[in-house]
C-alpha cells in the first residue's frame, strides 16, 4: 500500500465521503521526495491555529518544523528530510486560545513504552507472511457450522517471567501457542492490544488505535505472533473499542484544543462510569478514522475477528435516565460491518451487547446491525446466578436455566464465561460454587458440561480451564502452581477431555444456530433440579442425550426419555474418578426400553451422579442410521424458535 500525497487528495474523500485507507494519508510515513529520504507527517486538526512536528531531532523546538495546512478542513502536513526509523515525535498544536499542547500522533503505528508517551516513526511494511494455508483452510469452512472454542486472555497477566517482567510477543508465541493447541481451542481472544497508558485499564482506554502496544515489542513482533498462531491452526480475535477513549492529555481528547474525535455536547461526550469520552460517531472524519483502523488491523496484522466492546454504550445515549437510541452509532455499526465483510466475508464480528436490541447478528440488508456473532450476556448472568445459589434453593429459580432457550436462535450467540465475571470481587468461577471443597469442583465440572452442550459457540477466560481459585489479578500471572494440587489436575484433565469431546461431536455444534439442533427432554423437573435434552447434528443418527443434575443427590435407575435407538453408551460422566468425582458412572451399555417417556419413543434407566453431567450417545447398528427393523430413527423436534443464517 503506497503513501498518498495528501496535497493530491480531494478533501471530500476524507471529510465527506467513505474513505477507509486514511492510514495511508495520515501518520508518519518514510518516503523519498525530491530525491531526499525522510518522513512525511500528516495530521487532521480542524481547529488548530498552527501546527509543528517536534522531537529529539529538533530538541522539541516548536519553531523549527512548522506544518502546512493543506485543506480548509484542517489537514496539516510536512516533509522532514533525513529523519529515520525509530525517531520519536509529537505534534505541537497551537490552539485558538493561544496555548501550545503536545499530542501523540493518532495514526502512529508505534509508540514509546509507557510511561513515556511519544509516537515513534516505524515502517509498518515489510513483514513476510507465511499464512496462506491458513487463509485457504478458513475459506473452505463455514464458521456457523463448525466447532468454536475461544480462549480469552489478557496478554500481560497470562504468564510472567520469574523476575515479574512481561513476555514479548515473540516469547508469547513460544509459551502460549503450544498450550492453546494442547487444549484444542480454535481461537484466542486477546484483550485490547492498542497503545494505552494505564496498565489497569486492560487496554480498553486507548490512546493509539493504530499502534500495537510497545509493552510487548514491535508491530512486526505481533505480526510474527499472529503468523505463528495461524501456522498451528489458531484464529486470532482482538478486543476493539470503537465507542470511547481515554482522556489522557497526550491522546485524542480535545486533540486541537476543542472536541475533535469526541462529541461536542458534554451530556453525551462524557462517560462517567469509565472516566472516558465517547467518539462522535456522526462525524465523517471519525468514522473514517475508526473503520480505516479496523481494516488496518485486518490487512496488516491478519486478524481473524474483533470482539467489539461496549456496544450497549454505543447504541444508547448515556444521558442519565434516558434510553434514546443513538442513530449515529446504529448507522456507524452497520457501515463498519459492511466494510469489514466486504474485505473478508469469513471474518468474525462479535458484539459485546447486554441489551435486547433486535437483529444484532442479522445482515444490514435485513435491517440488522450486521454482526455475525453476539455474546450471550443474558445466558451468562442467569447461569452464574443459578450456580451461586445454594443447591437446595435452585428449584425456586429453575427458569434461570431454561429461559435462554426461548431466545437462543434469535441471534448467533457465543456463550461467554469471560473476564468480566471473575474480577472486582465477583470471585473466580470455582469460588462462585457453593459448598465444600469437593462440591466446588464437582459443580464447576457440571457447569462446564452444561456450557459445552448448550447451543452456542464457546468462550472461556484464562485460568478457568484448571480451576483458578482466586479471581483474576491483572497485575499478577495465573496461579500455575495450582497444578501441584490433585483436584486442579483432575479439573484440567476433565476440561481437556470435555473440549476434545465437544470438537469431535457434531451434534454439539453443527446446528448451533438452528432450532433443529436442540430439544428438551425434560425442562420442568425443578423439584430435583435435573435437566435433560437432546443435541442434534445434520444427520438423524448424530444425536446426543445430555442429563444434568444440579443437586448433590444421587439417583439410581432414573428414567430418561430418549430417541428410538436400541442402545446407548455413556461417553462422558463428570463424576468419574479420573476427574475427581465419586465414581457414580454408567459403565455398561444402556439398552433402550421401548416404552414412551418424556415425549420420546423410548427411555433408558441410568445412574445420575451428584452434581453430575452425563452424556449419552446412541450405538449405531451395522446399517448406520437404521434400527434393526429397518425403519429410520427420527428425533422429534418441539422447538419452534426461528434460527438465523
UniProtKB/Swiss-Prot annotation:
It catalyses: Transfers a segment of a (1->4)-alpha-D-glucan chain to a primary hydroxy group in a similar glucan chain. Residues 619-645 are annotated as: Disordered. GO terms for molecular function: 1,4-alpha-glucan branching enzyme activity; cation binding; hydrolase activity, hydrolyzing O-glycosyl compounds. It is an enzyme of class 2 (transferase). Pathway: Glycan biosynthesis; glycogen biosynthesis. Its EC number is 2.4.1.18. It comes from the Bacteria. Catalyzes the formation of the alpha-1,6-glucosidic linkages in glycogen by scission of a 1,4-alpha-linked oligosaccharide from growing alpha-1,4-glucan chains and the subsequent attachment of the oligosaccharide to the alpha-1,6 position. Belongs to the glycosyl hydrolase 13 family. GlgB subfamily. PANTHER family: 1,4-ALPHA-GLUCAN-BRANCHING ENZYME. This is 1,4-alpha-glucan branching enzyme GlgB.
Amino acid at each position: 500500500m503506497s503513501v498518498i500525497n495528501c496535497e493530491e487528495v480531494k478533501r471530500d474523500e476524507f471529510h465527506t465521503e467513505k474513505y477507509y485507507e486514511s492510514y495511508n494519508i495520515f501518520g508518519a510515513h518514510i518516503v523519498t521526495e525530491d530525491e531526499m529520504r525522510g518522513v512525511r507527517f500528516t495530521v487532521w486538526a480542524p481547529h488548530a491555529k498552527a501546527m509543528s512536528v517536534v522531537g529529539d531531532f529538533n530538541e522539541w523546538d516548536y519553531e523549527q518544523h512548522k506544518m502546512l495546512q493543506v485543506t480548509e478542513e484542517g489537514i496539516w502536513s510536512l516533509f522532514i528530510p533525513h529523519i529515520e526509523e525509530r525517531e520519536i515525535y509529537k505534534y505541537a498544536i497551537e490552539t485558538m486560545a493561544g496555548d501550545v499542547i503536545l499530542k501523540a500522533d493518532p495514526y502512529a503505528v508505534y509508540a514509546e513504552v509507557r510511561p513515556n508517551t511519544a509516537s515513534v516513526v516505524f515502517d509498518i511494511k515489510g513483514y513476510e507472511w507465511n499464512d496462506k494455508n491458513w487463509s485457504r483452510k478458513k475459506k473452505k469452512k463455514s464458521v456457523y457450522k463448525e466447532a468454536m472454542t475461544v480462549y480469552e486472555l489478557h496478554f500481560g497477566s497470562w504468564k510472567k517471567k520469574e523476575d515479574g517482567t512481561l513476555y514479548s510477543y515473540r516469547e508469547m508465541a513460544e509459551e502460549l501457542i503450544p498450550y492453546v493447541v494442547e487444549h484444542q481451542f480454535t481461537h484466542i481472544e486477546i484483550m485490547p492490544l492498542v497503545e494505552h497508558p494505564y496498565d489497569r485499564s486492560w487496554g480498553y482506554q486507548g490512546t493509539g488505535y493504530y499502534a500495537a502496544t510497545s509493552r510487548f515489542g514491535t508491530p512486526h513482533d505481533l505480526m510474527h505472533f499472529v503468523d505463528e498462531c495461524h501456522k498451528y491452526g489458531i484464529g486470532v480475535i482482538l478486543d476493539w473499542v470503537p465507542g470511547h477513549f481515554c482522556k489522557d492529555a497526550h491522546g485524542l481528547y480535545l486533540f486541537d484544543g476543542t472536541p475533535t474525535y469526541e462529541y461536542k455536547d458534554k451530556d453525551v461526550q462524557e462517560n462517567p462510569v469509565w472516566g472516558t469520552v465517547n467518539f462522535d460517531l456522526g462525524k465523517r472524519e471519525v468514522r473514517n478514522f475508526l473503520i480505516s483502523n479496523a481494516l488496518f488491523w485486518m490487512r496488516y496484522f491478519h486478524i481473524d475477528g474483533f470482539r467489539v466492546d461496549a456496544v450497549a454504550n454505543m447504541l444508547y445515549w448515556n444521558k442519565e435516565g434516558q434510553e434514546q437510541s443513538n442513530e449515529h452509532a446504529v448507522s456507524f455499526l452497520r457501515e463498519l460491518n459492511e466494510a469489514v465483510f466486504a474485505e473478508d466475508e469469513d471474518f468474525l464480528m462479535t458484539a459485546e451487547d447486554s441489551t435486547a436490541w433486535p437483529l444484532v447478528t442479522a445482515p444490514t440488508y435485513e435491517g440488522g446491525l450486521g454482526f455475525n456473532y453476539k455474546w450471550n450476556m443474558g445466558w451468562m448472568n442467569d447461569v452464574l446466578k443459578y450456580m451461586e445459589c445454594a443447591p437446595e434453593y435452585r428449584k425456586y429459580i429453575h427458569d434461570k436455566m431454561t429461559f435462554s432457550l426461548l431466545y437462543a436462535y434469535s441471534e448467533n450467540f457465543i456463550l461467554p464465561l469471560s473476564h468480566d465475571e471473575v474480577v472486582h470481587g465477583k470471585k473466580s468461577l470455582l469460588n462462585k460454587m457453593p459448598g465444600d471443597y469437593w462440591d466446588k469442583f464437582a459443580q464447576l465440572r457440571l457447569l462446564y458440561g452444561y456450557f459445552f452442550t448448550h447451543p452456542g459457540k464457546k468462550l472461556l477466560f484464562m485460568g478457568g480451564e484448571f480451576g483458578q481459585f482466586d479471581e483474576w489479578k491483572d497485575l499478577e500471572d495465573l496461579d500455575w502452581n495450582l497444578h501441584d494440587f490433585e483436584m486442579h489436575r483432575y479439573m484440567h484433565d476433565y476440561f481437556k477431555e470435555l473440549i476434545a469431546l465437544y470438537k469431535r461431536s457434531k451434534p454439539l455444534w453443527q446446528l448451533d444456530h438452528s432450532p433443529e439442533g436442540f430439544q428438551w427432554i425434560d425442562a420442568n423437573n425443578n423439584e430435583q433440579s435435573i435437566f435433560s435434552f437432546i443435541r442434534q447434528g445434520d444427520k438423524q443418527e448424530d444425536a446426543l442425550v445430555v442429563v444434568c443434575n444440579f443437586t448433590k443427590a444421587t439417583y439410581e435407575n432414573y428414567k430418561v426419555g430418549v430417541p428410538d435407538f436400541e442402545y446407548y453408551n455413556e461417553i462422558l460422566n463428570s463424576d468419574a474418578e479420573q476427574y475427581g468425582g465419586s465414581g457414580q458412572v454408567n459403565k455398561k451399555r444402556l439398552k433402550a426400553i421401548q416404552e414412551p417417556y418424556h415425549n420420546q419413543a423410548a427411555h433408558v434407566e441410568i445412574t445420575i451422579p451428584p452434581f453430575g453431567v452425563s452424556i449419552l450417545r446412541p450405538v449405531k447398528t451395522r446399517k448406520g442410521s437404521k434400527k434393526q427393523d429397518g425403519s429410520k430413527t427420527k428425533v422429534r423436534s418441539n422447538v419452534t424458535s426461528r434460527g438465523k443464517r
